[in-house]
């Protein structure tokens, strides 16, 4: 076939025949009148940087095959397979032959496939699988790396180090599994502390710096067994976590590998072999340039473009399209949060179930022990012929505890609510009946009152009725406008005068001092949590560092602490630093460092040669009176004692003036009291009634007790010290301030009361005058009706005199105040 006018006359069809027609048309279109019909039919793809293009030289044009030039167009055949699989060698060859050389080659090609008709005779020898029925319905899905043990693998270099260096002269040897566990722990710790170690491998941390991170428990990977054992309380001592002395074996989980079953705990391995193994591992880490010593499989990470990297395994075949909306992300994140919450809830429930079963097991074991003890007691009682008192040896039936479930609790709440509703309905019905009875009685009363009013209204005149209505309206309005009666001694709101009990000044100062101490303790505890066992606070130890202190005899006023930030009243002459205090006390310490008051290290020739006068601190022994070490007495004395948990404390006893017994005996005669108590030889003397014992204890208390500390007043006496006045003056000033405030508020209340009283008297006068005028008008109208005078006559009304009204009000106010006084 040939193309006419460069137009494409063939149609797109499926099959090798149509492919041959299309290829022939393409060839004829190229060889025809010069029109490129293939270019109009085929869409050229964009040239990619990753695609390899073949370069043809001018000398190679005459030797090129036309089929090779049109290779891209010849492959445009509907194969029915995916685009990525069209490049397969056998399929590619078949497509070329089917499209171009089908009429020349009668032999058909096919894609080779393995012959699956035959069976392998040695299959049972290598694949002997047996189905084992599972014991639980809970399944888990984890990777092989999570269940096959530690990821580190021992090689020849590690084996040589383990045999020739580490285990050469040691009795308790480190096996290969424990060595791999240590190296894996090192790898995990370095990943956490130094994630960018490949930038500079020489800066790898030392063993002492990595040790706190190694001792932390990794609950998500290797120490899940220890966590479960601690939470269930099955293993109290982590050193016996893998011991099977109980007969029950170690506490294992599904995630534990069989290779790590007999491995000792990581803290024990770190203490015994950690330093030597870490030095060997760090050398290999530096040789690997900070990367992993054993290369791991490189997987495809989401969000990273690693399409060119040939070492990425298990690459996904589909294209990752960019996500343009955030709605799906929000929904997925919410689902993940809900899933995480449910998983945590399931974990807590499983741990609680494990704890419950552990407690039940412990109860059963205790019952068995009690039974054995009872049997032993019964045998002993039979041997000794002891009868009776056998109730303790009988196992009484225990009452089954009532378990309050959620359903029972809900039923009880519903019953209570129904009872409340029934009671309320009964009360409402009774109230409705009472209201109906009251309404009936009120209606009858109203009818009687209305009849009486009709009779009285007929007797009275219409004009008098209008006047009385106006007066009653004005009176009601005046009563509504009148405020509530006030009194001088009425209790005002708490916002103006606080209704509180004034506390003692000493109590307030003590509370302030307690709050300051509590604040300091909370800050120290918070700082300890922030350090996270990575830093050690040496200031908590009274022995290390040791200071040679001298106290100031007096404190000047400008340098005295007037706030919570107190300046130091101690002057440090020399300070000492040593690693081990016991070696120093035994006299064998050699690494003692001495610093002067400026913080500079003293390295004189005398000290370098071992001058003990500079390096040695004096130790005072109060029981060794024969050999005194001091020419003068220390301002403070120390006492060493052991407290709870075998914690050593160093107490400080301040030097105070001893209270003389003679001064105390000036007030109390001890001999007379002792003679008086010795006279009562007939009866035993109670300790609480002994006056001699009471006064002797009081004397001992006065010897060592003092209301002040060793440096003067308490820090809580700050208000008086800030104002440069005494504490008594500060108390008087505070009381005067409260008195003036209360006096001002009392004065305001008195003025307000007088104003209300004057306005009330004025209103009463006005109402009385209005009533008098109304009565005069009524009398005048009655006289007119009796005499038969015309209705248009007017009655003279006396106007209200304001001046007289003011005088009357003033006189009433004076009389009222005199009565109050």
UniProtKB/Swiss-Prot annotation:
Transmembrane segments: none annotated. It holds the Pfam family EPL1. Component of the NuA4 histone acetyltransferase complex which is involved in transcriptional activation of selected genes principally by acetylation of nucleosomal histone H4 and H2A. The NuA4 complex is also involved in DNA repair. Involved in gene silencing by neighboring heterochromatin, blockage of the silencing spreading along the chromosome, and required for cell cycle progression through G2/M. Residues 1-43, 427-485, 779-799 are annotated as: Disordered. Residues 1-12, 786-799 have a biased composition (Polar residues). GO terms for cellular component: NuA4 histone acetyltransferase complex; nucleosome; nucleus; piccolo histone acetyltransferase complex. GO terms for biological process: DNA repair; positive regulation of macroautophagy; regulation of transcription by RNA polymerase II. Belongs to the enhancer of polycomb family. GO terms for molecular function: histone acetyltransferase activity. It comes from Candida glabrata (strain ATCC 2001 / BCRC 20586 / JCM 3761 / NBRC 0622 / NRRL Y-65 / CBS 138). Component of the NuA4 histone acetyltransferase complex. Residues 18-39, 449-465 have a biased composition (Low complexity). Its main location: nucleus. This is Enhancer of polycomb-like protein 1. The keyword Metal-binding does not apply. Keywords: Cell cycle, DNA damage, DNA repair, Nucleus, Transcription, Transcription regulation. It is found in: Nucleus.
